[in-house]
Amino acid sequence: MIKTVALVSLSAGTIGEDFVKHEVNIGLKRLEQFGLNVKIMPHAMKGIEYVKNHPKERANDLLAAICDEEVDMILCAIGGDDTYRLLPYLFENNELKEAIEKAEKRKIFLGFSDTTMNHLMLHKLGFGTFYGQSFLADVCEMEDDMLPYTKKFFEELIKTGNIKEIVPSDVWYEERTDWSESAVGTERTKHENEGFQLLQGKPVFAGKILGGCLESMYDIFDNSRYPDTISLCEKYNLFPSLEDWRGKILLLETSEEQPDPKHYRKMVET
């Protein structure tokens, strides 16, 4: 049973901005309603510019959360596009390895999108993670409650420390166009979901998941977003080896960038 959650901003520092204060307040209240204590790590609420310009402080927040014996879960605030910049501050002097070894209990690490890079960093050191909800995108949902599918799995994770079975949602939702405080309590437009599309193989399978956001993983091999992604990811050997992938369920999700089919194919083939 999860009791204490550490909130970290390892990518964008959005939750420190005034324009999302109403969402953040909703999310913090929801976590408390789940019976959770919330620890906001020192730099998580510093805002977009500060967080962007201080990757070392982001890394320090992660290390502190891992070492904090009161913390049961590390919840990422939101994605972004540059959490790869934490690599030198986590691996150059074995900082992350030592923090994991120092921690006396297993912690849940949760997030998605650019957080893929953090998942791969932790995977590299044998620290199992869960690819799932982020604080701002999911817990802070502006409807009167979290979306049912999202809430179901979040509750299962905080109550049991695991996810037993993943089934498709009955519905899918359109993204909001109004994120202002006046939109609090309004429902998203939803549509019936037809479920998973089976291309080949057995319809039911089990195993460990490895993967994440396609654009983030593509950045490991492409410098078009930032000039140093390839060099940093190569230096610290971030991408999993062929042996790591053996027997895993490949997870790929695309971001709000909505790549066209040609670019999608290029990213997958890379």
Which residue ranges define each predicted feature?
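Conserved anion/nucleotide-ligand pocket segment
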Residues: 128-215
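Long, hydrophobic/aromatic-enriched structural stretches that serve as scaffold segments
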Residues: 67-94
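Hydrophobic structural segments
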Residues: 121-124, 210, 215-217, 243
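ATP/NTP phosphate-donor binding region
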Residues: 1-72
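Internal helical hairpin/lid segments
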Residues: 222-270
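Short, acidic/small-residue loops that bind anionic groups at enzyme active sites
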Residues: 90-124, 128-136
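Gly/Ser/Thr-rich loops at beta-strand to alpha-helix junctions
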Residues: 11-15, 78-83, 110-117, 257
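Structural motif
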Residues: 75, 110, 249-253
